[in-house]
């Protein structure tokens, strides 16, 4: 419903900005921005630490960013989407976190969400072949607790961790 989503603490994704929600010392927030230029979409998000953030939250944000950095190295012609998911899930699980399987990256172009679906859990050497000209997002959503989630019943958009644990996300559009 907005061109910018703000996902705070246990909001996994699609948090709707509100002037009623004031950031607090120690919060972590993901700001997810969609842009359209000449009919083409792009999508990106970044994490921000507000004030004095505890070491556990800081580590979650760092591990999530590091998993994306590793995944970006897997993006090359004739690679596989499964390689991207594998490197993310392996790294995240090594650090004791979970990564969402049911919500992931997506193709972008003339529409905001296009094929392919980019799962952030995968097996090396499997999945769609990466070919020149593909444009898609890599955006793992990493939870401090379990990967279970629920969608806000009122707005049918905002996604929360089921167990109330923190969640972090970094997103890049790659071409």
Which functions belong to the PLM regions below?
Residues 1-175:
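Active-site neighborhoods and metal-handling regions in enzymes and metal-associated proteins
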């Amino acid at each position: 419903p907005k061109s910018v989503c703000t996902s705070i603490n246990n909001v996994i994704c699609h948090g709707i900005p509100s002037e009623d929600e004031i950031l607090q010392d120690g919060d972590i927030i993901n700001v997810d921005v969609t842009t359209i230029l000449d009919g083409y979409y792009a999508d990106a998000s970044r994490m921000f630490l507000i004030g004095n953030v505890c070491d556990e939250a800081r580590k979650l944000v760092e591990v999530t960013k590091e998993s994306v950095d590793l995944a970006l190295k897997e993006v090359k012609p004739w690679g596989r989407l499964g390689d991207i998911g594998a490197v993310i899930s392996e790294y995240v699980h090594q650090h004791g976190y979970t990564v969402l399987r049911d919500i992931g990256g997506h193709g972008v172009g003339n529409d905001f969400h296009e094929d392919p679906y980019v799962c952030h859990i995968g097996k090396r050497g499997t999945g769609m072949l990466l070919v020149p000209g593909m444009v898609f997002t890599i955006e793992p959503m990493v939870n401090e607790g379990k990967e279970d989630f629920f969608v806000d019943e009122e707005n049918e958009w905002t996604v929360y961790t089921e167990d109330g644990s923190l969640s972090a996300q970094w997103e890049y559009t790659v071409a």
